[in-house]
Amino acid sequence: MTAPIIITADMGKADQAWANGLRRAHFPAERNRVDAHITLFHHLPPSHLPEIKSRLAALVQNYPAPAADLSDVMLLGKAVAFRVDSPELLSLRDELADALRGLLIPQDQATPKLHITIQNKVEPPVAKALHAHLLESFRPRPLAISGLSAHYYRDGPWELIGRWSFRG
């Protein structure tokens, strides 16, 4: 069977570099197999790749880059992430979800809580310590969203299928 497809929102170059740096510093090295990312869909069927690519291309051609903000530092048990607030990005995701309705697994049928994970699969006290440390200097700020990407999930590293940039 071919690998499932993951859809992510791409960050602008400076934000991507910043998030990747934090992820390299705090994610267990043996588990850090992908760059920092904002997941929109976790598991789309590869048999529908032509339709998925076509819909992603249409979305980015029809809309400017959505506004987004880093709004909080989240403690998720054994993980730490930055909350991403973007009603515009969620609206685009909803449009895509409606178009792909019959293809979505239960996890992808629900509206996601957008975030960027920078630490995962650590003991809760380690996550708590990083969360407290990041909260000390955290200030909400804008986050650049530049496009959408599709990847094959390969039991660890992802394989890039393609990137589509928002107009303007």
Locate each region found by the language model.
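Charge-rich, low-complexity N-terminal segments
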Residues: 80-85
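Residues that line or immediately flank small-molecule/substrate-binding pockets and catalytic motifs
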Residues: 41-42, 77, 152
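Short beta-strand segments and strand-loop junctions that repeat across beta-rich extracellular domains
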Residues: 145-155
